[in-house]
Amino acid sequence: MQWYHILIIILLSLTFLFFLTTFICYFLTFFIGKKKIYAKNEYDIPFGKEYEQYKDLMIKWQKEMRELSYKQVQITSFDNLKLYARYYECTEDHVLEIMFHGYRGSAERDLSGGIKRAFALNHNVLLVDQRASSLSDGHTTTFGVNER
């Protein structure tokens, strides 16, 4: 076997490893599989010891949020996905706070306490469910890049 055959095999192997690593990183970081839609008596609470002390408070806020009236709004993204948000009106023609949830989160889980704070300031609220979360379409989170 010539030296250039070995070099080609090494280069092809490295290329394969590069693409395999890229795919694995994408899958672990950006891909979001089947989304769970929670029933009326179920609550989305993050896992981990750091959240245990706040569990009752998070459930309380999510219950309160579910009792508020809101208007469901949606837009269609450039790549033809339906993206949803909920508009909560506190005071007509007043300040609007637009809230976005965190990584692999949802508006209900991450922002239910924010509604209470915003309403205390007489602010209206738009809670956005970014792509691949809650009701919004998609399976890949883009950290808001494609929602601009």
Model regions and ranges:
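Serine-hydrolase catalytic-loop signature spanning alpha/beta hydrolases and amidase-signature enzymes
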Residues: 102-110, 125
